[in-house]
Every structure is written in structure tokens, then in C-alpha cells.
Amino acid sequence: VAPVPEPFRRLLPFAALVALAPAQTRLLRFPDLHGQHVVFTYGGDLWRAPLAGGTAARLTSSRGVELFAKFSPDGHTIAFTGQLDGDEQVYVVSSEGGEARQLTWYPSRGPLPDRWGYDNQVYGWTPDGTAVLFRSLQNAWTMNGCQLYTVALPAAARQRGALPVALPMPVAGAGEFSPDGKRVVYSPLFRDFRTWKRYQGGWAPDLFVFDPATGAAENVTNHVRTDRDPMWIQNRIWFASDRTGTLNLWSCDLQDKSVRQETQSTTWDVRWPSSGGPKDDRIVYEKGGELCWFDCTTREEHAIAITVPDEGLLVRETTVDASGLVESYALSPGGRRAVFCARGDVLTIPKEHGDVRNLTHSPGAHDKHAVYSPDGAQIAYVSDRSGEEQIWLVDHRGETPPRQLTKGLQAMLYEPSWSPDGKWIACSDKDGVLRLCNVASGELCVVADESRGQLRDHVWSPCSGHLAFSMTGQTDLRALHIYSLADKSLHCVSRPLSNDAGPTFDARGERLFFLGLRGFQPRLTTAYEFDFQVDRCYGVYALALRKDLPAWLPVRTDEATAPPKKDEPTPKNDGPKFEQPIAIDFDGLADRVEQVPVPLDNYAGLDAAGDGLLYRRRGGVYYGRDSDQPATLHFFSQKERKSEQLASGVSGYALSPDGTHVLIRTGSTWAVAEVTLKGKDGQKTLDLRGLPVPKLPAEEFPQIFHEAWRRYRDFFYVANMHGYDWEALREQYAPLITHVRHRSDLNYVLGEMIAELNVGHAYIVGGDTGAPPRPSAALPGLR
């Protein structure tokens, strides 16, 4: 059993607290109150609890989420936004629980990105309790065109109500009616789900009081920072604002327009405040995952300790099919097995006979970039099960536990590559540092440091004595380099004005093939203007590593030859044997270049294999759509001096370590082919159906949290993280992870942590939410 990683170990005390019932539950969201009860969302469902705290009672349970619950003025009914049938609609349910009734039926927009929030978001009720107030996209293309609507409750339980009625404001985000129902306080902007803390700019919402009778609108907050979540309580407008750096409660006197700060939180935002009604002087909100209520008269805050007896159905361990979640793949020597990294696990699949093997079974780690050793006995891969990405080794049968090979690395790692003798592994990181790792000892040494990006095309010579790769040269173009292990020397082997990448050694160690941007093959475009389109300019080239080598494709000439004498046996070729490193004549190497006779094109992959070259050709690149030509995989034979297409629609491929077979990916199909001119025939399709991977959200959620934290640490555009203590922010938000019961809550925690960096367009999206299928509805285009 692997040791608990240090970042995960920090969560164990909190996990222990959660396990001891009754304990306070956190991540209670979107609260509302009436009388002596609060309603809120936890784990995607609605719950009700006493205002004084205690144990919550479940109100809803569905595959989708239920959000934005609002008590009716009499407290008997709760309106909410729900996904009961797949898309977001407005529902009502008794405050004691029971069957929910659907009020809206117009097809909602979605699923929307997290930063957009939800369609048909409920905001409250009309003061007389006859209709529900909500915001909808039904007449808008984007969120900046939303409107507020009311929809009346039907007279009978099984009767459908009237159609929604739009309020007269042309665009609107959050809103609430005045106590007499004659005016509305609202925000014309909606960006309540965008993770922009302390934002100042054109998208900072202000609050307006609108009078439908006169059409007059008055800005009552008028500040450069965010003013949101309006509540109309007697003669004051209450709202949330981050004017002091953190969202707090503020209020505005409607008579003299004076504004005052009501709460003083400096660590956690006051989020989604909601009042008990226009005559109730209490406001409930979430802060740090907990619920609090504020007495508007005494101006005092009261914490609410609530225990949610959630059965944890959404975080139970299950087995899922990961065949559609393949992240990386490789082929074994001889092509008899393939290794896949899918949904964080390392699995091997037979070409034809045998079982599927999950070698890591690690729902709490992200395992990726798995590759077979040259002898097929081990598999190297990258994993963060120690808390940072390191190189790990596992037996190809999975009979022994995985072994951590490297220690102390602190950056995202890319694909490792084995030396042919199995003694070394080369691996680079996001900083462009290329290292060699001794397989026996785990010791590391730096080979190169790319200062302008990543270094990911490193390849080994067949003798294991040299490593070739491309990195930025003095002219800011990619240049080929060769590193010699014997004397630890690094040689640039490209011309200064060449743009070369994708090197690959031939099996004899005599040549280094590569892709070079050395041609110019413009096409004319005449559809809108007479202009040049310059693509298809990459060629395939070869460098002769020794001065005495003949051309790879010598000039052919027909000559009369005599058969070999009987006492002179025909030479037998058993393939190259390397007892010592191959010799490379670096003097003049950049000039010993030969172009392989394949046309200039858009190439995206090159490997020396068999008696020739394997390469992938793709179509032209277009803005906003896929290429008009499918990517194809080809093999060029040196002996036959011709090329044959092996597959079409190829999204990727992986060559076996011995170069005899190739794993080809075409869409969701995987096939193994021999690397020959006739490799198109006899391809064997792999069966990935039902690829079994354990799903254990209780372990996956902490891993996702810490990996997201590392991604920002590694890739944020300035090293000082905008001056914030990024480690301290992880410590602040990590305890919330043990309370996550739904993937949307994990996204919320991640978004809040990242928002602390005070940067725009840094969003969290996606994830396995388990949302039900959305209904398909056709609209006639009529109103």
C-alpha cells in the first residue's frame, strides 16, 4: 500500500472529524430562511434545518441538482431551480417535502459552463406569493442578455400554470421586488458565477431601483467594485460587495443614499445572502462553507451549526468504463500488449488473447504517460501519488506494488522514454528541463534546459549512448541537439536558420531523421482576395552521423553483376549489435543532410521503423473548424523507395520499442498493425469496451484539488502568484474538500481558491457531474 501523500495527509484530521457523527457539515450553499428554518443545497439536493442549528432533513433527491431554494412569503412552499428531468426548470415543493411541481417548460440552455451559472435561476417571489421571480435565457443568446420573469403558481396541483411574463427591464441579473411589489431592485449585469474576486471594470455590477410605472431607474450603489445579491428590507437595500477586498454585507439607505458596511469578514466571502422577507430583519448567507444569519437590527452575526445526514450515494465506490477517457497509450515490444492510461489508472490490454490488467488501482492518484521497458518486463509512468509528480515503475503483470523511482521533483512531468538497454529513463518537465534517471538508483542528472517552452521530442540512439531532441536555438527557431552520455557534451546539429524538430534514430545508429520547416510551397487563394496560403512546408530529412556513410537512398543505376562464388557465402544480417556507443562525427554534421523523397506537407509525427520511416500527415489548419482532410499514417520503405498509407482518420499512434508494430488510434478505435508496406492488411482491432477502472470520489476529490493547485503553481504567468501566498491559500481551502458530495461543489471550491489570485478568465469547467440526460426539444421559431 502506497504511503499517504503529504498534501492528502493534511486532510486526514478533517476527514476524521467528518467521520464522527454528529459533526458540523460544510459546503452548505444557496441558503434562504423563513421563521425558524433555513433551506439550502448540499450535495446537489435541497435540505431544511432549524435556524438554531441541528440535523437537517432532506427535501429533494434526484440525479440532477436542485439549487436556489426560496421560501414563499407564507413559508409553506419552496421554489427552486432543478434538473429533475435533465434541464434546468423552475419547480415548487412543500416546505415539508413531497412531490415537486414544474412551473416552467421552455427548453433551457445548457449544460452551461460553470462561469455562466444556470438557466432559469430562481430569485424569490412576488410579495403576495402568487408568482415566482426567476432569471432566464429564453430570449437571450448570452448571459448579458438575460431577463427577469415571473411565473404564476397554478390553481390546482396537477394543473399547468400560465406562461412566464418578462419584467420590463431589457436585461437583468439578480433582482428582488420592493415590499409593496411596485418596484424592483436589480442588477443589469450577471457575472455571479465568474471567479473574479476584487474585480474592477465594466463588468462590475451596480444595483438599480426600477419603477415599471415610470420606466425610471436609479443607481443606488454606484461603485467600481462588485455590488450583487440585492435584498429589499423595509427602507434599505442590502447587498454583498467586495469594496474592502472581501465580499461582505452592506446596506444603502434609500432616503439619503448613504452606504454602510454591515459585516467585517476578511478571510471568507459572504456569499449568496438571502433575507427572510421584506418585513424580516434577518439575512442568511454562506461563509467558508458554513451558514450564518445576520440580525439587521442588532447588526450581529450568528453561526449555524448544521449536520447533514447525507448517505453519500454520490461518493460511493463504483467501477466505471474508462474506454472513452484514455489519456495516453503505448505498445509493448512485439506489439502483443498495449498499455493505456485512462481516468488516472494504468491498464494493459492484449492484442488478442488474455485479460485486461489494471496495474495501479489508484483512484487517489493521477497516473499517466505509461511506457513499456525495452524488454517488456516493466512499465514506467508518471504519478502524483506521493503529492508531486514523480516517475514510478510497475511490473508488467501487476504482481508487485508500484515502486517510486524519482524523488524531489516539483513540476509537471511529460512522457518518459527508456534507453534501449533499459538502464536510463529520460523525462522532461513543464519548465523545459530534460533529465536522465538511473533506473537502478533513481539518481537524476540534467541534460538540457529549454528556456522558451517545453522539450518533449527526446529520443534515444539504439546504442543508448546518445539522446537527440530539439530546443530553441540562438535564432529562436527549433534546432536539433545531441547529448552524449559518455562525456556529458551537448551538440547543436542544425543550421542557425533551420527550423527542425521530431528527431528519430535509425536502427543502426547511422542516421538521424527529422522534420524540417525548410521548404516553401505557397498556394493561391482567390475566394475573397488574391493572397498566399503558406502551409504544407514540412519535409522529412536525414542527417548522416558519420562522414563515411553513403547516401541513404543512393543514385540507382542498372549494372551487370555476377552471382556470388560458391566458396563465398551470402552475407547474413542479424541486425545491429552495440557493444559500445556509436561513433558520431559532429564536425560538419549539420551539412550532411539528405531529403527523403516524400512531398512537403503538414507532418505531425515521425519514427524510424523497420527498413524505413513511419510518419503522420494531417490536413491544413482552419480557424473554427476541423481540417477538410483526415490525418493519415504512412510507411516509407527504403528498400522499395515508396510509401503506403496504413490508416486514415488517425488522431495518434505509438510505435513499439522494437519498431515492429504500431498502435493506431482512429477516433475511438484502436488497432495494432505491422510496420511494413502491407501493414494496412491484417490489422488487429483492440477491444476496449468496458475498460474497468475504480471510481472512488472520496479519494479522487482531494487528488483533483491538489493537482489543480499544482497546475496553477507551475503555469501561472508570474512566479509570485500576484503577490498572494499560494501555499497558505491551499491550506485555507483544503479542509472543505472532505465535505464535497457533488462534483459541482468541488468545482466551486477550486474556483474560489483560484479566484483569490485576482485574475480573470481562470475558470474551472467540466467534471463527472452525473447529470441526467437533457431532453431534446424542437422549437418552431415562432413567438
Locations of regions flagged by a protein language model:
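Beta-strand-rich domains and repeat architectures in extracellular enzymes and scaffolds
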Residues: 24-49, 325-347, 597-618
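Flexible, low-complexity junctional segments that flank or bridge functional domains
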Residues: 155, 404-407, 422, 620-622, ...
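Long hydrophobic segments that form regular secondary structure
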Residues: 332, 588-644, 727, 731, ...
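A flexible loop/linker signature enriched in serine peptidases of the S9 family
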Residues: 41-47, 61-66, 79-95, 99-120, ...
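Hydrophobic h-region of N-terminal signal peptides that target proteins for export
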Residues: 15-23
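Blade-terminus and WD-like Trp-Asp/Gly-His loop motifs, strongest in beta-propeller folds
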Residues: 32-35, 69-77, 123-131, 175-183, ...
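Conserved blade-ending motifs and adjacent loop-strand segments that build the rim/top face
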Residues: 260-274, 491-502, 600-604, 642-653
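A short helix->beta-strand "capping" segment at the edge of beta-propeller domains
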Residues: 24-28, 54-56, 310-326, 582-599
